[in-house]
Amino acid sequence: MIKSLLLLISIIIGIVISQEGAYPPAGIYVGLSSNFLTTEGESLTTYAQNELLSMSLPDQSGSSSKASYTFTSFKLGLTLDNIFYNQLQTDVYQIGWETISFELQWNYHICANAIFNPCENGNIQVGTVSGASAAVASNVYVEFNSTSTSIIATNTTMAFDQGAVQVNVHCSNAICVIPVSDIANEVAQNFVTELTNGITKAINEQVPTIEALFTPIKQIPMTLSNGDSFWINLEGTLVEESNPTADLPTITAALNGGVILENTDGNFVYPSQIPSYIPTDSQLESFTSDYSIVVTGFFIESLFDAVFASALPMTINPSQVPSASPVQLNTSDGFFSGVAPGLSQYPNLGIQVNCYSPVTPLVSINSSAISLFNLELSADFIILNGDNPFTAFTVLFTIDASLSTEILTDSPSTFSLNSTLASMTPNATIVTSTIGSVDATGFVQLMQMVQGVIKLPSPAYSVPSKYSMSNVELQLGTQVIQITFDLIDSSLLEKQKIIKKSINFN
């Protein structure tokens, strides 16, 4: 049985099909453990119960052709048990409780519109019968697009077995002849309407917290100097764990996870790749913490793809090279005159470099490193010969590299991935030349020189403000990077602090 807190995942999915143990290829898998779902389900149940028990139940009075009445001192007892979640159809879900038990009591004073106007007093009880079946559920509509997510709970209904709800009237007078049941039934029906409306309201009030759990990963917190930004494609599928044993089994959102480039002009560029790797069930389900993020190579490949699409083609002019750089873009520079002797025919002229046509690397992950293979980048070296610039030669760079990654806890609610270039194996091929021979090994040495100054971005991830993190861990496995941590409700921590202060006698 899929239960209510799966809604936490469904808010970020445009195409959702709940299935058991059949994971599709994806770039990101976000898992919520059975223990976490159970805890959150209990919190939602408590919140809904408290909201219903705090409903205003004012005194009522009215009259009909047969009698006038006054109802006072309403009291309500209510319990919700066994929270559940179902998918009804695409983008329409159901959240509710398998069992609802309640008892509503109030006092009555009623007078018949007859000779002598006889009046009676007593109390009325409306409630569920022990052992009978009564349930309540709300329809929840989820809408996701590239800019916003909307979750709305509507149409809460209660379902009863016949005889599950009874109305009992207790008259305290010696003689009781005035019929009260019809009016009591009407009040009971109105109460059920208020009750279902209250459940709808309680769920909708929790929507911001539910949405916030996944909102931080919609956009990669990284912006290039040109203002371009990067989003994650969150279309995906909900998957139950392969062999569920708990009432609330571990659930994973298998998300496309491709990185989408948003240009400053508002256009979107989607990845040229598609996900192909499927982690094993064990890789996705064996975590013991509350929360798991599993990343496959497709996410990294599409990130390179998006960065290249944003940054390239790129032109580097001589004026952009710092004066302290050991290599200057000039035909008379020691490096260029050494690798391309033919440049001596064009002394002291600037060189412009046009970089283009990248080939995104293939990514492989094992327990010790993230490896990049066959990254290709072409560069034209253009001599700025007055009004007649021309391409002196073109170099094709092919690079294999290895990345090391560590996780840093920046605050109780934020962590970042710090990746560094552990090793790099560059190769260079001279594709064309108009100035004679060019020594490709010189460009290999140049790439080796810049290895130490290459800086990789360290994107940060923040959990919703309701939570703080503990036990944050990073693990590399076969073709996956897995981050796991526990989520602690910050409000519970504050309550614990208050309790500790209250018993401190020093």
UniProtKB/Swiss-Prot annotation:
Disulfide pairings: none
Sorted UniProt keywords: Glycoprotein, Secreted, Signal
Glycosylation sites: 145, 155, 330, 366, 418, 427
Coiled coil: none
Stored SUPFAM superfamilies: Bactericidal permeability-increasing protein, BPI (SSF55394)
Keyword set includes Amino-acid biosynthesis: no
Molecular function terms, GO-annotated: lipid binding
The organism's place on the tree of life at top rank: Eukaryota
GO CC annotation, single: extracellular region
Glycoprotein recorded as keyword: yes
Signal sequence coordinates: 1-18
Subcellular location: Secreted
Main localization, broad class: secreted
Family: Belongs to the UPF0522 family.
Protein name: UPF0522 protein A
